[in-house]
Structure formats: structure tokens, C-alpha cells
Amino acid sequence: MPCFTVGLNTAKCLSSALGVPLYEFSHQAGHVAAAVYSSGHIELFDREFIAFHVSGGTTEALLVRPDEEKLLNIDIIGRTLDLNAGQAVDRVGVAMGLKFPAGAELEKLALKSQKVFKPKPCVKGTDCCLSGIENKCLDMIKSGEEQCDIALYCLDSVAAALEKMTKNILGKYGNLPLVFAGGVMSNSIIRQRFTKEFGAYFAEPAFSADNAAGTAYLTYLREQKNA
């Protein structure tokens, strides 16, 4: 992406001008490292684990292994085949008249609902399709259903898809530790559900959408290795 190229070139210029080392890490590595660091479980850097990055721009499941050179070796093992989770949440929220990004306001509404939903997620192996969530919620809006119920259905449906993906991934790769990152995973409804069911680790809300802190921590680890 062009924005990453600009950042990389700026870093190269600063490295050259200051005479300091330049360490390159992927966008995903930054998010994963921020999540692991803020969860308080830095021991995961020394073992294999599963990480989910769930946001408006990404909905991916990652197999993460220690790597001598890159520190983290990351392979995508599951993903959305259409909408990202954050896109579905924001589109539904905006359609309801909420401000973009809509995640926080949608959560507040959902917590007021007394309904119990049992969504049927569209999951194919370790991949998911989330566009049906938006379509169903738009139908609910047109039908005049309560906004709090629509909000809860949306978030429950996202959680159900991620839950099914998680079960399929654990069945395929074994009972590995789980780490969740990305703005969508700062949602308290989803966090409580996954903590209870899987014992998953989460980035602190302030770090959920942050990868700069993760990149800084990876740089620290690299410096420690080189010392």
C-alpha cells in the first residue's frame, strides 16, 4: 500500500541521517506484537500461537511462530471472503444513523437489548463470509425493528462467525493459545464471550487498533538480540 511505502522511505532517510539501524517489520507483525505485549503474555513470543486481526481493513486468522530473523513468522490461515468485520459493523451503524466509525455506539445500543439471537454464520473451513450480516441488518432496519436489537444481532453475528472460525482452526492446528487484536476486538460483548469460551488473550482496548507500539516492541527485542 502507498501509505506503507511513504513510511518506509521516511524511516530509511532517518536511519541514514542518524546513522542508526533500520529494522523492518510487517503491518500484521506490529498488530500481533502490540496485542501480545498489552495482554501481558510476552512468553508467547517464544512459542507457536494463533492470532486474529479483526478490524475495518482486515479480518484474518494468523499462525504465528518464533523466527530468528523476523522475530515473528506469520502465515494467514483464515480470512473473510468478502466484507471485513469492521466494515460490516460500520455499514450497519451508519445505516442506523450513527457516526462513523460506529463500533462504540453500536456496542452501547446492543447492551440495551433483551433479545436472544442464534445467528447461523457463513463459514467455509477456516474462512468466513460476512456480507450476509449487513444484508440482514438492513432488512431489520427497513422492518422498523428496535435499534438496540439490530445492534446486538450485528455484533452477535460477527462473534458467531469468528467463533466458528476459531473452532475450525483449533481443530486443524491443535489447541494453541489465542490472541485477538484489531479495533473490532475491543468490543466488550465479543471479548467476554471469547474469554469465557476459549480463554483467549486480548489486546488492551488502547492497543487493539495500534501497531506502532508493537513495531516499537519488536525493535526493542531486536536490539536485545543484537546486544
List each language-model region with its residue ranges:
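A short glycine/serine-rich beta->alpha loop
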Residues: M1, D75-T80, C122-T126, Y201-S208
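Short beta-strand-loop/turn "lid" adjacent to the catalytic site in phosphate-handling enzymes
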Residues: M1-K12, S16
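Active-site nucleophile and cofactor-binding loops and adjacent substrate-binding regions
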Residues: V6, L22-G30, H53-V54, T80-L83, ...
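Conserved phosphate-binding catalytic cores of ATP/NTP-utilizing and phosphoryl-transfer enzymes
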Residues: F25-F49, L218
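Glycine-rich phosphate-binding loop plus the immediately following alpha-helix
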Residues: A29, R65-K112, D139-G144
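Glycine-rich phosphate-binding/hydrolytic loop that grips phosphoryl groups
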Residues: H31-A35, A203-A227
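Short beta-strand scaffold segments in enzyme catalytic cores
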Residues: A33, A51-H53, T59-L63
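A contiguous, well-structured pocket-lining segment that forms one wall/lid of small-molecule binding clefts
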Residues: A104-L178, V184-T195, G199-Y201, Y220-A227
